[in-house]
Swiss-Prot record:
This is LIM domain-binding protein 2. It comes from Homo sapiens. GO terms for biological process: epithelial structure maintenance; hair follicle development; negative regulation of transcription by RNA polymerase II; nervous system development; positive regulation of cellular component biogenesis; positive regulation of transcription by RNA polymerase II; regulation of cell migration; regulation of kinase activity. Belongs to the LDB family. It is found in: Nucleus. Residues 298-337 form the LIM interaction domain (LID) domain. It comes from the Eukaryota. Interacts with LHX9. Interacts with SLK; leading to negatively regulate SLK kinase activity. Interacts with LMO4. Its main location: nucleus.
């Protein structure tokens, strides 16, 4: 037997401690990783076109971004649409941030028909501030993302609930200004509010006004109208929607029961079976064009069950009805075979055209003549 190698990093592929390859990163988290890389590739010369391309790559056309946090004057909740998302990320860097990335820990994923939901209760937004002092801000909270279930996997909803934040200052900076009380007093003050800069907070407050004005701005851009005319048109259309009569509530359509159509064979077989059971004599069938009301009494008709357009329950059982026709005489016309034999539905060589052999009853009715002695 060969001895085990002394290399501590060696592991035999046939041993119990075989090291497998690292599994691939989960796709939704990988999209956040790609977004972090794209934010790191930002330069000081990045203009609005760069931010629009960034938002187009990672956000859907109807995406929404929501931030929830609590300030000194109470809880706040801001929701912005797709057109305002690029400007939101740009204001983060305009407030003195040099680096921005998100860290997701222990995220939970749920797959739906057309979307993937990622719920991360331990999300950290890390921002590096170069102004006025080098400070690292860690904003912790819960991040809920909804991705589209397609090849692009863009974000449809972004909801970040901030719980707490921490501002970290390097010890080296404190040691450099240990003899300067003014600088130490400045370093002791927070540079953010709940991890957000003043630029970002002011922009979110402005979005409260800008979000309802998206319709006015889009109309002005499309029809080249003056702001006053755009406002008049929007107000008139909104007034029309308000005074318009309410739409009638959609009534649930009644489930219609379909009755199975009686074919030629089923009609003839059912009538023949009923005749055999009632009279106990020869099997006789009626014509194929007889209506349902002219059939033999005590006919049991089974309706089709409701397969679509309703919930399954007692109403979806097969409906069995009994048809009674007191005007119909079962003994009238059943013994007349000429109409049946001359029916065009039967061929010339049909076995039904041949007359059945004489039975004992016919022999008794027509006795043969006796020979004269």
């Amino acid at each position: 037997m060969s001895s085990t190698p002394h290399d501590p990093f060696y592991s035999s592929p046939f041993g119990p401690f075989y090291r497998r390859h690292t599994p691939y990163m989960v796709q939704p988290e990988y999209r956040i990783y790609e977004m972090n890389k794209r934010l790191q590739s930002r330069t000081e010369d990045s203009d609005n076109l760069w931010w629009d391309a960034f938002a187009t790559e990672f956000f859907e056309d109807d995406a929404t971004l929501t931030l929830s946090f609590c300030l000194e004057d109470g809880p706040k909740r801001y929701t912005i649409g797709r057109t305002l998302i690029p400007r939101y990320f740009s204001t983060v860097f305009e407030g003195g941030v040099t680096d921005l990335y998100y860290i997701l820990k222990h995220s939970k994923e749920s797959y739906h028909n057309s979307s993937i939901t990622v719920d991360c209760d331990q999300c950290t937004m890390v921002t590096q501030h170069g102004k006025p002092m080098f400070t690292k801000v860690c904003t912790e909270g819960r991040l809920i993302l909804e991705f589209t279930f397609d090849d692009l996997m863009r974000i449809k909803t972004w909801h970040f609930t901030i719980r707490q934040y921490r501002e970290l200052v390097p010890r080296s900076i404190l040691a450099m200004h240990a003899q300067d009380p003014q600088v130490l007093d400045q370093l002791s003050k927070n540079i953010t509010r709940m991890g957000l800069t003043n630029f970002t907070l002011n922009y979110l407050r402005l979005c409260v006004i800008l979000e309802p004005m998206q319709e006015l701005m889009s109309r002005h851009k499309t029809y080249n109208l003056s702001p006053r005319d755009c406002l008049k048109t929007c107000l008139f259309q909104k007034w029309q929607r308000m005074v318009a009569p309410p739409a009638e509530p959609t009534r649930q359509p009644t489930t219609k029961r379909r009755k199975r159509k009686n074919s030629t064979s089923s009609t003839s077989n059912s009538s023949a079976g009923n005749n055999a059971n009632s009279t106990g004599s020869k099997k006789k069938t009626t014509a194929a064009n007889l209506s349902l009301s002219s059939q033999v009494p005590d006919v049991m008709v089974v309706g089709e069950p409701t397969l679509m357009g309703g919930e399954f329950g007692d109403e979806d059982e097969r409906l069995i009805t009994r048809l009674e026709n007191t005007q119909y005489d079962a003994a009238n016309g059943m013994d007349d075979e000429e109409d049946f034999n001359n029916s065009p539905a039967l061929g010339n060589n049909s076995p039904w055209n041949s007359k059945p052999p004489a039975t004992q009853e016919t022999k008794s009715e027509n006795p043969p003549p006796q020979a004269s002695q």
